[in-house]
């Protein structure tokens, strides 16, 4: 009888916050206390209007992938976050691109989870008594 012993693979958590204005790719250890790498889309492009684009998210994810592969991380658990609260719950345009880029870099996917904050009671919207005058 042969026993197959799996090698211990280092796992990490990828916290991806994708809004319409920017995409954050933040890699921590499993507890979330130690940051391994943190890069935003705005750090990789020059024009401010391009910070939230899928291209900026791809560049940020490529840089993060090279850093964490150098540290020996093989498995990633994804936690995706949109703006949430009073703002839109939908993820920004860079979320899918960031995930796809990290997978193409050779990292395995553990689990994907949506952690967008949801307001249980509606937070009072801006505008005051007479409403927001546009």
Curated annotation (Swiss-Prot):
Main location: cytoplasm
Swiss-Prot/TrEMBL GO biological process terms: translation
Gene Ontology MF, one: structural constituent of ribosome
Compartment(s) where it occurs, according to its Swiss-Prot or TrEMBL record: Cytoplasm
Pfam families: Ribosomal_S11 (PF00411)
GO cellular component terms given for this protein: cytoplasm; ribonucleoprotein complex; ribosome
UniProtKB keywords: Cytoplasm, Ribonucleoprotein, Ribosomal protein
PANTHER family according to UniProt: 40S RIBOSOMAL PROTEIN S14/30S RIBOSOMAL PROTEIN S11
Family: Belongs to the universal ribosomal protein uS11 family.
Subunit structure: Component of the small ribosomal subunit.
The protein, known as: Small ribosomal subunit protein uS11
Protein's gene: RPS14
């Amino acid at each position: 009888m042969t026993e197959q012993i799996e090698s211990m693979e280092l796992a990490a958590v990828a916290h991806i916050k994708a809004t319409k204005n920017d995409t954050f790719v933040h890699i921590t250890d499993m507890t979330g206390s130690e940051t391994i790498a943190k890069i935003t889309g705005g750090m990789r492009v020059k024009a401010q209007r391009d910070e939230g684009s899928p291209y900026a998210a791809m560049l940020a994810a490529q840089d993060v992938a090279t850093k964490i592969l150098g540290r020996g991380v093989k498995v990633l658990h994804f936690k995706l976050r949109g703006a949430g609260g009073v703002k839109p719950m939908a993820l920004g345009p860079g979320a899918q691109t960031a995930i796809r880029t990290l997978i193409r870099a050779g990292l395995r996917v553990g689990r994907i989870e949506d952690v967008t904050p949801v307001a249980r009671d509606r937070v009072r919207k801006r505008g005051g008594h007479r409403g927001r005058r546009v």
